[in-house]
């Protein structure tokens, strides 16, 4: 009874499609994919920034206020 069979998965998938519809699921999948790509990109950008700081190859710029 505790096992998840392919039949149970198909029934759950059919219920989800009936409840939400294929259009809503398609847009939800696209939004989820975009969010994951954005998260991965942000993680890679932050890792690159940390490596630059550790190497010391990037110097901090002095900022001044112009009036």
Swiss-Prot record:
Keyword Transmembrane helix assigned: yes
Transmembrane segments: 4-21
Recorded GO CC terms: TAT protein transport complex
Membrane-protein topology: Single-pass membrane protein
Biological process terms in GO annotation: protein transport by the Tat complex
A molecular function (GO) term: protein transmembrane transporter activity
InterPro entries: TatA/B/E, TatA/E, TatE
One Pfam family, short name: TatA_B_E
Location(s) in or outside the cell: Cell inner membrane
Taxonomy, superkingdom: Bacteria
Keywords assigned by UniProt, alphabetized: Cell inner membrane, Cell membrane, Membrane, Protein transport, Translocation, Transmembrane, Transmembrane helix, Transport
UniProt key word Protein transport: yes
Protein task: Part of the twin-arginine translocation (Tat) system that transports large folded proteins containing a characteristic twin-arginine motif in their signal peptide across membranes. TatE shares overlapping functions with TatA.
Family note: Belongs to the TatA/E family. TatE subfamily.
Protein name from the UniProt record: Probable Sec-independent protein translocase protein TatE
Organism: Salmonella typhimurium (strain LT2 / SGSC1412 / ATCC 700720)
